A protein has these predicted regions:
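Short glycine-rich anion-binding loops that position phosphate/pyrophosphate groups of nucleotides
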Residues: 28-31, 94-96, 219
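A short, flexible beta-alpha/helix-coil linker loop
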Residues: 30-32, 128, 184
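Glycine/GP-enriched mid-protein hinge/lid loop-to-helix segment characteristic of carbohydrate kinases
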Residues: 1, 47-48, 52-177
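Glycine-rich phosphate-binding loop and adjoining helix at the ATP-binding site
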Residues: 1-6, 10, 14-87, 227-236
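Solvent-exposed beta-strand sheet faces enriched in polar/charged residues
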Residues: 26, 67, 92, 216, ...
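ATP-binding/phosphotransfer module of carbohydrate and carboxylate kinases, centering on a glycine-rich
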Residues: 1-21, 134, 138-277
Length: 277
């Protein structure tokens, strides 16, 4: 990973000679933005903390800032989104599930930098093992990784072409296509995941009372029916406002992938604005 980052850095340095380049990197899991240490990355094949900022600054001789990938989405939404709201949440539903919060216009990280780990809220204490070491986390039910794993077992039982499953994976495109084509078992798996997301989100809404939520990630490809299942699960919130302005709005995020990735660069903007004048 570090070698790939270094290669990309030097490629841009050659292309933009004489221009000072600073890096901003987003990774999943728990990140200490002050030290630039990736503390835990559940989906990675390694389990020890990685001092990304220190290692890259030593190798490249440039400034590096590191934060969580959902913080990246939150900053992208804050600075590039069409709606100018002070409180909102972004949720990334992809191979894992994460979230980030903007409260009073500021990123909320928590003292231990572990806020937003909605994917590791426990849905079923007796459920499947999660990469984080616990059991029954939301990710084990609703993430793309979990649904693909269950779908592969189902497809093998249905006599699917062994060559198509030779790599031991079901692709995202294949999963989305079967869902859209009305495959009953695949739809049941996806709908179960959507209901689980809605349940976790319902609990978050009652605690934080944030009424603007944007969903990102490849799971958004399941479409409007998937979104409505999530919304329906959160619709029983007794503390939600009934008026159109203050009621909870859960929507697909509208930022392009390029805009989303640009979000991590706003770490430098946020830091500059926070400095005393």
């Amino acid at each position: 990973m570090l070698r790939l980052i270094e290669a990309c850095y030097y490629q841009h340095k050659r292309r933009h000679k004489g221009l000072a380049i600073r890096l901003a990197i987003a990774v999943h899991g728990q990140v200490n933005p002050a030290t630039g240490v990736s503390q835990t990355m559940p989906q990675a094949p390694w389990h020890a903390p990685v001092e990304l900022k220190y290692l890259l600054e030593e190798h490249l001789g440039c400034e590096v800032m590191v934060d969580n990938d959902c913080i990246m989405l939150a900053l992208a939404q804050k600075w590039q989104g069409a709606e100018n709201v002070g409180d909102f949440c972004v949720i990334n539903v992809d191979y894992g599930i994460g979230s980030a919060f903007i409260i009073n216009g500021q990123i909320y990280r928590g003292a231990l930098f572990g806020s937003g780990q909605i994917g590791h809220t426990i849905i079923n204490p007796d459920g499947s093992a999660c990469a984080c070491g616990r059991y029954g986390c939301l990710e084990t039910i609703a993430s793309l990784s979990a649904i693909k794993k269950r779908a592969r077992v189902f497809l093998k039982q249905q006599g699917a072409d062994p060559a198509a499953l030779a790599e031991g994976r079901v692709g995202t495109a294949q999963l989305l296509a079967r869902y859209q084509q009305g495959d009953l078992m695949i739809r049941a798996m996806v709908d179960e995941g959507a209901r689980a997301i809605g349940l976790s989100l319902y609990n978050f809404l009652n605690i934080l009372n944030i009424n603007r939520i944007w969903l990102y990630g490849r799971s958004c490809g399941f479409g409007e029916e998937w979104l409505q299942t999530i919304i329906h699960q959160t619709g029983a919130n007794p503390f939600d406002c009934s008026d159109a302005v203050n009621a909870t709005h859960i929507r697909f995020g509208q930022l392009s992938r390029a805009q989303q990735v640009m979000g991590i660069g706003y770490l430098y903007v946020e830091r500059a604005l926070a400095q005393p004048r």
